[in-house]
Design a protein with these regions (language model features):
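Short, flexible coil/linker segments at or flanking structured domains
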Residues: 1, 35, 166-168
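N-terminal, positively charged regions that mediate nucleic acid binding
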Residues: 1-33
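Short glycine-rich or small-residue beta-strand-to-loop segments that form or flank ligand, phosphate
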Residues: 2-8, 37, 44-52, 98-102, ...
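Conserved active-site and cofactor/substrate-binding residues in soluble primary-metabolism enzymes
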Residues: 12, 16, 55, 59, ...
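Short, non-transmembrane amphipathic alpha-helical segments
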Residues: 17-20, 25, 58-71, 147-152
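Conserved beta-ketoacyl condensing-enzyme motif
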Residues: 29-88
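Glycine-rich, mobile lid/loop segments that gate access to catalytic sites or pores
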Residues: 42, 69-175
Length: 178
């Protein structure tokens, strides 16, 4: 069984905010050392940032509002630990953050990705899609179930009923859905 979430899922929103904060660090210096964790939901965005860059909280808050809408923000910026920072100087990267990927997708994963992109192109709201062999479960917010049933007649669509989704009803955190 595989699962895919779309760009409006709260975990993906948290990832986009973290990415924007990293971009701000790169705008300040050539090779910043930075680690960002974001937790977002229910009208609040919490971000903890460990960095060598001199970041402006107002710019971070502006990025949060651009990506997720106006909400309360709790931004903590601290200097990166000097030992971690020193470990990052040369070719060997020995920090505590990293994402490694690079495996080929299975046919089932490719099909689910195609379905997820198709649905998100029509309904750009929070959604999750699960495929288990030939069984397809579509959980899509802010859409009439009957409308999706016309497109994917063999799928189980919103098996728990219609729902709203997004960060007003769910919480997202960085690096949970990659």
């Amino acid at each position: 069984m595989i699962e895919k979430v779309n760009p409006s899922h709260p975990d993906k929103v948290a990832d986009r905010i973290a990415g924007a904060i990293v971009d701000l660090a790169y705008a300040k210096e050539d090779n910043p050392k930075i680690a960002v964790e974001v937790l977002i939901g229910h009208g609040v965005c919490h971000a903890i940032i460990e960095t060598t860059a001199d970041l402006d909280k107002a710019e971070i808050i502006s990025a949060v509002h651009r990506i997720a809408g106006v909400m309360d923000t709790d931004i903590v910026i601290v200097p990166q630990d000097k030992h971690l920072s020193n470990n990052q100087k040369d070719g060997i990267r020995c920090g505590d953050n990293g994402i490694f990927k690079g495996m080929p997708l299975t046919q089932e994963q490719e099909e689910l990705s195609r379905i997820a992109h198709d649905i998100y192109g029509r309904c750009p709201y929070d959604g999750k899609y699960i495929m288990d062999g030939v069984r397809l479960i579509i959980c899509q917010s802010n859409v009439e179930t009957v409308d999706l049933k016309r497109l994917y007649s063999g799928a189980e669509i919103n098996p728990l009923g219609d729902w709203t989704g997004g960060t007003d009803v769910d919480t997202g955190a960085t690096n949970r859905k990659l």
